[in-house]
């Protein structure tokens, strides 16, 4: 029988891998945003997004833009597909984090 610690460790590994995928997709989205949507790139401080002095309100602006699916009206298909991917990966990673935390309290 598989121990609870093994299951918890496997969930942690899967969660970390999915968060890494999310951050990689987010970096790619910001890079594509520079050409596809320069105004939004400036609004979310694309150049300083992942720095220690990044502005949290500007990061929340990108989160609300993706959450409300405002990108569906954009003309660039690559940009909209990246926004969809970032949104799906965020939902998946958040759900996995919740399951991992829940299972850590149960095990």
Swiss-Prot record:
Database matches in HAMAP family: UspB
> Keywords on this record?
Cell inner membrane, Cell membrane, Membrane, Transmembrane, Transmembrane helix
Q: Which organism is it from?
A: Vibrio atlanticus (strain LGP32)
What residue ranges are annotated as transmembrane?
A: 6-23, 89-106
Does the keyword Chloroplast belong to this entry? no
Q: What is this protein called?
A: Universal stress protein B homolog
Entries under NCBIfam families matching the protein? PRK04960.1
GO cellular component terms, alphabetically, are: plasma membrane
What does the sequence similarity comment in the record state about its family?
A: Belongs to the universal stress protein B family.
Where is it localised?
A: Cell inner membrane
Cross-referenced InterPro entries: Universal_stress_protein_B
Entry membrane topology? Multi-pass membrane protein
């Amino acid at each position: 029988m598989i121990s609870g610690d093994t299951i918890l460790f496997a969930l942690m590994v899967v969660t970390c891998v999915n968060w890494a995928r999310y951050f990689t997709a987010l970096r790619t989205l910001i890079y594509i945003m520079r050409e596809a949507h320069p105004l939004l790139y400036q609004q979310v401080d694309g150049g300083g997004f992942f720095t220690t002095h990044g502005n949290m309100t500007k990061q929340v602006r990108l989160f609300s833009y993706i959450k409300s699916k405002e990108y569906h009206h954009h003309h660039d298909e690559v940009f909209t597909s990246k926004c969809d991917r970032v949104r799906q990966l965020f939902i998946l990673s958040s759900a996995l984090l919740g399951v991992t935390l829940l299972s850590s309290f149960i095990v």
